């Protein structure tokens, strides 16, 4: 198994996924360890200068003017973690929680947060030994960072809170245990937080970035899958390949459109079905937009998803603590890097971009099941009337598309003041992340429905064969789901194709 060396500078989104899914380990890079030592030394030195330093020897938020006696500084950090662990709702799924731990460790490795080596080492040891904090999803407004989610992570470090014990490679369901018990079972000891450490752990954008990164990577795969689903539908509807010609795309110059059209051309190459309806015998002049404009719509989605990638690729290596500790200049400086606006905006874009992959997919399903549009039996049903075929599969897709329209209302346009007005503009970045995650989940299901219905249409076009890559995808799908010869409970078929998608079984 690969071991990633965290330095706060070079972590990639794909590496985040690898650690989140247990496919890679993480350790602290030697150079990063030295930076951590130096930043901690500066914090310790500042404790002796008699000055007020925010979050080190003062209260927090609107209580920043309150000086804390030296004897109470450890208690101050513990109280910060305890008081901020006010999250509610379902726990983050294990991959997202592991990504959260990884991202917090990575940004601490930058050496500008004043954390001790021991505390950072415990964070990484928790990842290594499968101690995954129970982190409620809700309760963050995205500035001052994701306070509540990160506080629940920090609880486990001090032997409090709850954690799942899920060692990498272990069989069975993870155990949910008190945090101290999970550490003990893993052979680890909690830490007593020193000045600045509680703040270094809870102040940052890593919860929204963790959820957003995994949603983004899934959306990127679905953007390619949307081309495959569209190609399969196009073949089933005897649609034209001509709108995907490179000269059309070049005349506009949008990069996502050019990439989507190239992918569609590759998927559709060598189609017997296409050859069968060329020439004078074909009465179609133009296909509906949901077929003809796939490069434009899928391409715009790719571009929006790409924008989100750029923001998150920077954010996973970003110092979002406050104050920041700069050993080279000897300064400890308060700022606003904890504000999640860049991530919130990007995740809203991700949700909107991905939603269009489902919206156009549902319209293609309508083309397939409507006999006046497809020339095929109503709802692709054998003995229609007695059988309803894929009638309600299309309704399910429509329901998810409409749900996405609600979810795509941007979280990042909202703000609500907190902390007695000191924190008077916030990002709602975690809300954007959770919404984007659900939108992407709905897109996956809509594309699975389209693939299921399009496969039936291809069956009905036999013996003519579709393009080779479409035929290969059809064959893989048929290994999981048989042809619909009479009505059956379609939810099982939808789940089977969805699982095939999640496993990457249709990535050609």
From Swiss-Prot:
E.C. no: 4.3.1.3
Post-translational modification note: Contains an active site 4-methylidene-imidazol-5-one (MIO), which is formed autocatalytically by cyclization and dehydration of residues Ala-Ser-Gly.
GO biological process: L-histidine catabolic process to glutamate and formamide; L-histidine catabolic process to glutamate and formate
Protein name: Histidine ammonia-lyase
Gene3D superfamilies documented for this protein: Fumarase/aspartase (Central domain) (1.20.200.10), Fumarase/aspartase (N-terminal domain) (1.10.275.10)
GO molecular function: histidine ammonia-lyase activity
Record keywords: Cytoplasm, Histidine metabolism, Lyase
UniProt crosslink position (5-imidazolinone (Ala-Gly)): 143-145
PROSITE patterns, A to Z: PAL_HISTIDASE
Annotated transmembrane regions: none
Encoding gene per record: hutH
Positions bearing 2,3-didehydroalanine (Ser): 144
Biological pathway: Amino-acid degradation; L-histidine degradation into L-glutamate; N-formimidoyl-L-glutamate from L-histidine: step 1/3
Family, per entry: Belongs to the PAL/histidase family.
Origin superkingdom: Bacteria
Biological source species: Anaeromyxobacter sp. (strain K)
Catalytic activity of the protein: L-histidine = trans-urocanate + NH4(+)
Subcellular location: Cytoplasm
Record's GO cellular component terms: cytoplasm
């Amino acid at each position: 198994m690969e071991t990633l060396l965290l330095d706060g500078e070079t972590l990639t989104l794909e590496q985040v996924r690898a650690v989140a899914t247990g496919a890679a380990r993480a350790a602290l890079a030697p150079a990063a360890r030295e930076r951590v030592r130096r930043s901690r030394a500066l914090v310790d030195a500042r404790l002796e200068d008699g000055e007020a330093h925010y979050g080190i020897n003062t209260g927090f938020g609107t209580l920043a003017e309150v000086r804390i006696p030296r004897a109470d500084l450890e208690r101050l950090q513990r109280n910060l973690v305890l008081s901020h662990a006010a999250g509610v709702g379902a726990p983050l799924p294990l991959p997202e929680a592991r990504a959260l731990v990884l991202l917090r460790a990575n940004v601490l490795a930058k050496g500008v947060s004043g954390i001790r080596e021991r505390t950072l080492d415990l964070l990484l040891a928790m990842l290594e030994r499968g101690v995954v904090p129970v982190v409620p999803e809700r309760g963050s407004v995205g500035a001052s960072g994701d306070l509540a989610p990160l506080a629940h992570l920090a609880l486990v470090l001090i032997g409090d809170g709850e954690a799942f014990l899920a060692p990498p490679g272990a069989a069975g369901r993870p155990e949910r245990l008190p945090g101290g018990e999970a550490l003990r079972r893993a052979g680890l000891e909690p830490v007593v937080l020193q000045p600045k450490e509680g703040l270094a752990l809870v102040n940052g954008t890593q919860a929204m970035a963790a959820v957003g990164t995994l949603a983004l990577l899934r959306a990127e795969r679905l953007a390619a899958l949307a081309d495959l689903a569209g190609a399969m539908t196009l073949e089933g509807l005897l649609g034209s390949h001509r709108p995907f010609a490179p000269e059309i795309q070049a005349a506009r110059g949008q990069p996502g459109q050019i990439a989507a059209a190239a992918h569609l051309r590759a998927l559709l190459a060598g189609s017997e079905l296409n050859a069968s309806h060329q020439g004078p015998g074909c009465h179609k002049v133009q296909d509906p937009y949901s077929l003809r404009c796939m490069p434009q719509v899928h391409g715009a989605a790719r571009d929006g998803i790409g924008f989100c990638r750029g923001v998150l690729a920077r954010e996973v290596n970003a110092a979002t603590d406050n104050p920041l500790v700069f050993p080279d200049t000897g300064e400890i400086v308060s700022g606003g890097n904890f504000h999640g606006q860049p991530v919130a905006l990007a995740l809203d874009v991700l949700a909107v971009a991905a939603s269009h992959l489902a919206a156009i997919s549902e319209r293609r399903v309508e083309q397939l099941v409507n006999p006046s549009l497809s020339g095929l039996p109503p709802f692709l049903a054998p003995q229609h009337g007695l059988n309803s075929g894929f009638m309600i599969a299309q309704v399910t897709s429509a329901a998810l598309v409409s749900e996405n329209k609600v979810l795509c209302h941007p979280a990042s346009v909202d703000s609500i003041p907190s902390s007695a007005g000191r924190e008077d503009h916030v990002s709602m970045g975690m809300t954007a992340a959770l919404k984007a995650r659900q939108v992407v989940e709905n897109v996956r299901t809509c594309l699975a429905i389209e693939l299921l219905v399009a496969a039936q249409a291809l069956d009905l076009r036999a013996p003519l064969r579709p393009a080779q890559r479409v035929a290969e995808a059809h064959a893989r799908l048929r290994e999981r789901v048989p042809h619909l010869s009479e009505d059956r409970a379609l939810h099982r078929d939808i789940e089977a194709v969805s699982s095939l998608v999640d496993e990457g079984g249709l990535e050609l």
